[in-house]
C-alpha cells in the first residue's frame, strides 16, 4: 500500500495544497511527513528524497507563508487549526501548526544539506526556523495554541505532534521528557477522558513508546482492544467504526499496528532502537523482518528479559547505528557485511 500512497501523493498533492484554506496546511504537512517517512524506510538516497519531497514541501511552505507574521523578532502563525479541538477553530500559534512548519523547514534544510545543494530561500528557511515562536506551554504541558489551554477532553493529540510523529522534541532531553509526560497525562485525564476515542488510545501508546515506557504503552493498547473506547467500536477483524457504526475510520487500526511495532523497534534520530519499549511482562518476545529508516530489515529475539540476538540486513548498503539496552559488547556472527 505504500506504493499506492506514494503514487497518490505524486498525482494530487500539488493541486490539493494550492487549493486549500491556509488554516488546514498542517494536515497536508502531516501527509507529506508520511510520504517522506515511506521513502526513508524504503532506503531512498537523499538525492531521490530531495527530488520527490522538496517540490511538495515548497508548495506547502508557500501556503504557510500566507499566514506567517513577524512581530518582535519572532515569526508567528496566524489563523491555523488544531484538529479537532472546538470544531476546527482557528488559533494563533497552534502547536499543531508550529510543529508542522518546524518539521517542514527542517526537512527542506536537511534535503539540501544532505545533497550539498543550494536554494535561493535556504537562508530564509533557517531564519524563520531560528525565530519561530516557541511551543505554547502552561503548567499542564503543551497547550492547544497561544492563549488557548487544553481545557476540554478531545480525541486528537494534534497539539503533541512536536513529540510524535514528528519527533522534533527528543525524550532523552530531561526537560522534554517532563513536558511530554505532563502533557500526555493532562490530555488523557481531562474530564475523565470523556472525549477520547480509539485513536486516542493508539496515539497515547505511541507517545508512551516514544518515552520508552512500555508498561503504559501496553496499558493503552490493551484498553483499546478490551475496554470501552468512547464513541468507537473495534470489531473482531480489527475493523474500526465510530458514531454507532456509521463512520469507518481506517487510520485507527493502522495507528494501532504502528503502536505495537513501536514497542519492538523504533528508528529516529539516525538510530535503530531494538526493544525500546517492551512492557515488563514481555520477558520472551521476538519480531521478524520489521523495517527501519535507511532501508534496513531487522529481526530480534528476547528471552528471559534479555535480548538474545539481532539480525539486520541493509537493502541499500547504508551505515546504521543500533541502540540496545543490556549489551556491553556486540559479536558479529555472519560472514557478510550486512
Task: Name every feature range the model reports, one short phrase each.
Residues 22, 90, 153-154, 288-291:
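Short Gly/Pro-enriched turn/cap motifs at secondary-structure boundaries
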Residues 304-338:
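C-terminal beta-sandwich/jelly-roll accessory domains of carbohydrate-active enzymes
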Amino acid at each position: 500500500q505504500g506504493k499506492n500512497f506514494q503514487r497518490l501523493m505524486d498525482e494530487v498533492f500539488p493541486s490539493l495544497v494550492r487549493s486549500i484554506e491556509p488554516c488546514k496546511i498542517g494536515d497536508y504537512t502531516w501527509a507529506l511527513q508520511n510520504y517522506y517517512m515511506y521513502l526513508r524506510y524504503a532506503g531512498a538516497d537523499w538525492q531521490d528524497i530531495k527530488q520527490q519531497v522538496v517540490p511538495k514541501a515548497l508548495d506547502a511552505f508557500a501556503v504557510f507563508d500566507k499566514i506567517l507574521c513577524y512581530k518582535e523578532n519572532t515569526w508567528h502563525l496566524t489563523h491555523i487549526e488544531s484538529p479537532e479541538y472546538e470544531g476546527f477553530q482557528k488559533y494563533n500559534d497552534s502547536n499543531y501548526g508550529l510543529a508542522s512548519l518546524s518539521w517542514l523547514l527542517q526537512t527542506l534544510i536537511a534535503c539540501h544539506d544532505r545533497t550539498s545543494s543550494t536554494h535561493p530561500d535556504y537562508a530564509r528557511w533557517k531564519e524563520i526556523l531560528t525565530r519561530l515562536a516557541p511551543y505554547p506551554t502552561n503548567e499542564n504541558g503543551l497547550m492547544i495554541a497561544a492563549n488557548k489551554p487544553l481545557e476540554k477532553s478531545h480525541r486528537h493529540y494534534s497539539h503533541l505532534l512536536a513529540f510524535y510523529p514528528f519527533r522534533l522534541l527528543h525524550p532523552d532531553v530531561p526537560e522534554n521528557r517532563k513536558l511530554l509526560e505532563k502533557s500526555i497525562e493532562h490530555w488523557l485525564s481531562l474530564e475523565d477522558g470523556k472525549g477520547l476515542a480509539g485513536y486516542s488510545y493508539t496515539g497515547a501508546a505511541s507517545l508512551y513508546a516514544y518515552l520508552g515506557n512500555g508498561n503504559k504503552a501496553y496499558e493503552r493498547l490493551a484498553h483499546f482492544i478490551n475496554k470501552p473506547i468512547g464513541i468507537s467500536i473495534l470489531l473482531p477483524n480489527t475493523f474500526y467504526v465510530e458514531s454507532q457504526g456509521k463512520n469507518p475510520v481506517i487510520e485507527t487500526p493502522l495507528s494501532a499496528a504502528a503502536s505495537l511495532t513501536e514497542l519492538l523497534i523504533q528508528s529516529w534520530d539516525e538510530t535503530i532502537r531494538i526493544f525500546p519499549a517492551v512492557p515488563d511482562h514481555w520477558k520472551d518476545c521476538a519480531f521478524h523482518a520489521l523495517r527501519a529508516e535507511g532501508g534496513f530489515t531487522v529481526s530480534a529475539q528476547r528471552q528471559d528479559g534479555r535480548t538474545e540476538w539481532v539480525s539486520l540486513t541493509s537493502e541499500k548498503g547504508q551505515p546504521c547505528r543500533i541502540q540496545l539496552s543490556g549489551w556491553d559488547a556486540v559479536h558479529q556472527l555472519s560472514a557478510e557485511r550486512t
